[in-house]
C-alpha cells in the first residue's frame, strides 16, 4: 500500500473511531457497554496514528495519538494515556515542535501524578532538547533541564541529575549568568573529586568555574584558583590549572600575545570545544589594546 492508501485507511479509521465515541455518549449505550465503544475507539485512533506515521504525515499521527490519549484518560488508564501522549509528542516533533512540547507536558503531568519521576525527568530532557534545537529558546531549555535535575535528585539518580545541571551551567554562562554557572560547576566538582571513578572530571568543572570567575573579575579568578588547589590538590598538576595561571599572568601584564600563545599550546594537545573557546575569547577581549579582538584565539 502506498502512502496515499495508508492515509486513506487512517482517515477511515479516524471517522470510525469518532462514530464509536459518539455512540458511547447515547443514554442506553452509556448504561450498557459505553466503555467498550471507547476502548474500540482508542484502538482505532492508535491504528490510524500508526498508519499516518507510515505515510509520514506526522501532524495527523500526533493528533490521532492525542485523541487516543484523551480516551485512555476517560477510561482511567493513566499509563496508557501517558504513553499515547508521548507517542503524540514524538510524532509532532517532526512537524510541530510546540505541539510536541504540549503533548510531552501532558504526559509529564500524568507521570508525576503517578509518582513516576524518573520517566517525567526523561521527558523534561526531551522538551529541553526541542527548545535547544528547534525553537532556540535557551531560557526555557534551562528551566526544563533544572526540573529534570530536581526529579532525578529526588530519586537519588545523582549522575543523571549532574548531566542536566552541567547543561544548565554551560547555558547560564553563555547567557552571562556567571554566578549561577560557578555555583553548579563548583558543586559538581566538589561532589566528584572524592569519587575514584569521577575525580578525573573534577578538574574540568573547576577549570570552567574559574573561567567564569575570570570573566567577571581577575582577582576573583585568582582566589578561586587558590581555593580549588587547596580543595583538590590533584588540580595543581593539571594542564587546566597551569593554563589558568598563564592566562592570569598574561592578563595582569595586559599581554594579548602571551594569552593567545598559552591558549594555542593548550589547544594543540586538548582541543578546545565551542564553549571553552567562547569563554576564553570573552576574557581575551578584556585585555587592553585587544579591543573587540579579531574574534580569534590563535
Swiss-Prot record:
State the taxonomy lineage.
Answer: Eukaryota, Metazoa, Chordata, Craniata, Vertebrata
PANTHER family the UniProt entry points to: BETA-SOLUBLE NSF ATTACHMENT PROTEIN (PTHR13768:SF12), SOLUBLE NSF ATTACHMENT PROTEIN SNAP (PTHR13768)
InterPro entries listed in its UniProt record = NSF_attach, TPR-like_helical_dom_sf
Q: Its biological function?
A: Required for vesicular transport between the endoplasmic reticulum and the Golgi apparatus.
Q: What is its main location?
A: membrane
Key word Protein transport present: yes
Protein localization = Membrane
Query: Which UniProt key words apply to this protein?
Result: ER-Golgi transport, Membrane, Protein transport, Transport
Q: What is this protein called?
A: Beta-soluble NSF attachment protein
Q: Which CDD domains match?
A: SNAP
Amino acid at each position: 500500500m502506498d502512502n496515499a492508501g495508508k492515509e486513506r485507511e487512517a482517515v477511515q479509521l479516524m471517522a470510525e473511531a469518532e462514530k464509536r465515541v459518539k455512540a458511547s455518549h447515547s443514554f442506553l449505550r452509556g448504561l450498557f457497554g459505553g466503555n467498550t465503544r471507547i476502548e474500540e475507539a482508542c484502538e482505532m485512533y492508535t491504528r490510524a496514528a500508526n498508519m499516518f506515521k507510515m505515510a509520514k504525515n506526522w501532524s495527523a499521527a500526533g493528533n490521532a495519538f492525542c485523541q487516543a490519549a484523551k480516551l485512555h484518560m476517560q477510561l482511567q488508564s493513566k499509563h496508557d494515556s501517558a504513553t499515547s501522549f508521548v507517542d503524540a509528542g514524538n510524532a509532532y516533533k517532526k512537524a510541530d515542535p510546540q505541539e510536541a512540547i504540549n503533548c510531552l507536558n501532558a504526559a509529564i503531568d500524568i507521570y508525576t501524578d503517578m509518582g513516576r519521576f524518573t520517566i517525567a525527568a526523561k521527558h523534561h530532557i526531551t522538551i529541553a532538547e526541542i527548545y535547544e534545537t528547534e525553537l532556540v529558546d535557551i531560557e526555557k531549555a534551562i528551566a526544563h533541564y533544572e526540573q529534570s535535575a530536581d526529579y532525578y535528585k529526588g530519586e537519588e539518580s545523582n549522575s543523571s541529575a549532574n548531566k542536566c545541571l552541567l547543561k544548565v551551567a554551560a547555558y547560564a554562562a553563555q547567557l552571562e549568568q556567571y554566578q549561577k554557572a560557578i555555583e553548579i560547576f563548583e558543586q559538581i566538582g566538589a561532589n566528584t573529586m572524592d569519587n575514584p571513578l569521577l575525580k578525573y572530571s573534577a578538574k574540568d568543572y573547576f577549570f570552567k568555574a574559574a573561567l567564569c570567575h575570570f570573566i567577571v573579575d581577575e582577582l576573583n579568578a585568582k582566589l578561586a584558583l587558590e581555593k580549588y588547589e587547596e580543595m583538590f590538590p590533584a588540580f595543581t598538576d593539571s594542564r587546566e590549572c597551569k593554563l589558568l595561571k598563564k592566562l592570569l599572568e598574561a592578563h595582569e601584564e595586559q599581554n594579548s600575545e602571551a594569552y593567545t600563545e598559552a591558549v594555542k599550546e593548550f589547544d594543540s594537545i586538548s582541543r578546545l570545544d565551542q564553549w571553552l573557546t567562547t569563554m576564553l575569547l570573552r576574557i581575551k577581549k578584556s585585555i587592553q589594546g585587544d579591543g573587540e579582538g579579531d574574534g580569534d584565539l590563535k
